[in-house]
């Protein structure tokens, strides 16, 4: 099977510069000795409107740019590559490889960059040519076609040509769950599908969490819930695209993993404390951004989203400064007991999913103890007040309501280890948990 998978050793990076609706070639990627290196093209360096793809990683200068310590390819490039789901789609559609066979194949990162769809998250794309840009997978499939395609990929069944084209469009998206990209006249969405392995309504859980986050004052991506082919589909409005006369502008983005100069093998070291330090020095509106990030950490704990890894946080990049993107991928995780931990460290070596962890770290976000307490209390009351209405919007079954409420949402473990004046939060959580009819 591996003989069918080509190993590309070079690719050309194309980028949509700020305000533009067409890309220009930025430079060349080449694979060597297990690494992927980048150099800018002269035409791009001499372009008056050119910006670095990301600093300090890829400064706008001539020659091969050294990789940051520990990395095998530039992080801002890896951000544009597909993750688990997109790789399964590519291997299925292109090479007939089932998902569980991926680990046995020696596949170049450039293969995934060059075989994935062109409408990827952010402002980059990858081409075989430095002079001719040819977008891949422009077909706009129906949700029903996409649902059917996702089901076949999960089962390892080769796609038909029609379904192949339908799902390829979303093969460049990150994440492990089934998803695809869709477009209407003025808005683009990421469509997230139910999985055959789901033991409860994961899609509805994410819809509820995202809606509640927005109601709690968090800048969260807009979401809607629809049905297609008898399945729930979550539509997440893309915030990296702007519709203008003549086409679409793309907004450059980098993940927190890239900001922290880490890769997947080092992701366990990713820390909100370190991210807060970067925000203070490199972000627009640092004080407001720190408060927003603190609020997101609190909400993740209150809703049971322990999958808050560093690729689930991102910032727009304008060539000089970073700006936090809307929140996304806030999804309550399955939980059999109480004790839990976050994917990212909160401060020091502490990643425990407790409000006490947030309060202890508040000073890193330039928040006083009373300010941090007020944020937690406000979210608690907001979640409890809006839970019945948002659950109804999601047509959540009684079984799933009982599963989510008090287990993912407002799990008692989140309120352990609170001391002094903060202990009022535990009492408030107990009151709200018991007063709201799931």
Residues of each region from the PLM?
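Phosphate/dinucleotide-binding and metal-coordinating scaffold of catalytic cores
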Residues: 1-310, 314-438
């Amino acid at each position: 099977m591996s003989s069918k998978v080509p190993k590309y050793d070079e690719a050309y990076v194309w980028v949509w510069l700020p305000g533009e609706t067409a890309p220009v070639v930025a430079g060349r990627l080449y694979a060597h000795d297990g690494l992927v290196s980048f150099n800018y093209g002269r035409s791009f360096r001499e372009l008056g409107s050119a910006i670095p793809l990301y600093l300090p990683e890829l400064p706008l200068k001539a020659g091969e740019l050294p990789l940051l310590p520990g990395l095998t390819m530039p992080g801002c490039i890896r951000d544009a590559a597909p993750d688990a789901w997109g790789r399964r789609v590519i291997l299925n559609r292109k090479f007939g490889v089932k998902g569980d066979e991926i680990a046995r194949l020696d596949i170049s990162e450039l293969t995934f960059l060059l075989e994935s769809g062109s409408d990827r998250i952010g402002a980059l794309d990858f081409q075989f040519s430095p002079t001719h840009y040819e977008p891949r997978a422009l077909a706009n499939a129906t949700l029903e076609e996409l649902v059917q395609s996702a089901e076949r990929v999960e089962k390892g069944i080769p796609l038909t040509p029609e379904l192949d084209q339908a799902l390829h469009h979303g093969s460049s998206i990150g994440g492990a769950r089934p998803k695809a990209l869709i477009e209407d006249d003025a808005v683009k969405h990421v469509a997230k599908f139910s999985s055959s392995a789901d033991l409860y309504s994961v899609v509805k859980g994410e819809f509820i969490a995202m809606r509640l986050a927005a109601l709690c004052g968090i800048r969260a991506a807009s979401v809607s819930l629809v049905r297609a082919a008898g399945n729930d589909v979550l539509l997440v409005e893309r915030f990296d695209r702007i519709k203008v006369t003549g086409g679409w502008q793309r907004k450059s983005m980098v993940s927190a993993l890239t900001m922290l100069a880490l890769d997947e093998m080092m992701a366990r070291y990713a820390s909100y404390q370190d991210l807060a330090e970067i925000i203070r020095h490199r972000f627009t509106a640092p004080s407001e951004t720190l408060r927003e990030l603190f609020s997101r950490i609190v909400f993740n704990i209150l809703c049971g989203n322990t999958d808050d890894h560093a690729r689930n946080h991102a910032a727009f990049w304008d060539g000089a400064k970073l700006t936090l993107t809307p929140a996304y991928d806030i999804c309550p995780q399955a939980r059999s007991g109480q004790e839990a931990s976050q994917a990212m460290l909160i401060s020091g070596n502490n990643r425990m999913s407790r409000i006490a962890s947030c309060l202890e770290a508040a000073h890193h976000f330039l928040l006083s103890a009373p300010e941090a307490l007020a944020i937690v209390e406000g979210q608690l009351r907001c979640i409890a007040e809006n839970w019945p209405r948002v659950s109804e919007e999601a047509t959540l079954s009684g079984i799933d309501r009982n599963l989510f409420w008090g287990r993912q949402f407002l799990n008692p473990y989140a309120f352990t280890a609170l001391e002094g004046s903060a202990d009022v939060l535990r009492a408030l959580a107990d009151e709200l948990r018991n007063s709201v009819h799931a």
